[in-house]
Amino acid sequence: MKAFLFSFCYNILYTVGWLVTLPSYLLKQKRRGGFGTGLLERFGLYRVSYNREPKGVLYVHAVSVGEVVLALKFLRAWLRERGGSAVLATSTATGHATAVSAQIPGVRVIYAPFDLLGLPGRCFDRFEPEAIVLVEAELWPNFARAAKVRGIPMAMINARMSARSESRYRAFKSVSYTHLTLPTN
């Protein structure tokens, strides 16, 4: 019941907040060059060419330019050691441009879906990731729930969390973070 109530309230508040800020978001995206394909991808709508993507990819979620730079280093090392392919999801036009310009073979760069109910799941159904790596400690409830429902393990890199924040995450772990390990150290 607690998880349902949290999810219900979160989705109402997030959707209302999203609708209120949408005009300024669209203006900002247009100015920064992320308006075209990026907006469709934020709704989980991908170009036809993505239909040919291999399934079972590593999904790396990096929001800003700094996180993308770290994610690119991680992906180069991961793919050199293990091979395969990956999806790098970014949230900003500048982060997206940085990721695209790196041109790492086997890495598809997409815009991360909004955390609106159903959109993260649509993305995961499209790319069928084997695992998700979050750069930094940015957790979105619908994103985490969609991963949990699909049995996709999640890990964080470069995440620092205070004891206070950790206790808050653990207090809400019944909501959607039960499959995310929060190591101490």
Q: Residue locations for each model-derived region?
A:
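N-terminal signal-anchor transmembrane helix
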Residues: P23-G84, L88-V100
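Active-site proximal beta-strand in glycosyltransferases
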Residues: A131, A147-R160
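Nucleotide-sugar donor phosphate/pyrophosphate-binding loop at the beta->alpha transition
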Residues: D115-G121, R160-Y177
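Short, hinge-like loop/turn segments at secondary-structure boundaries
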Residues: I104-V107, F127, R150-I152, F172-V175
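A transmembrane-helix-recognition feature enriched in membrane-embedded lipid enzymes
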Residues: K2-L39, V175
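Conserved small/polar residues in nucleotide/adenosyl-binding loops
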Residues: T178-T184
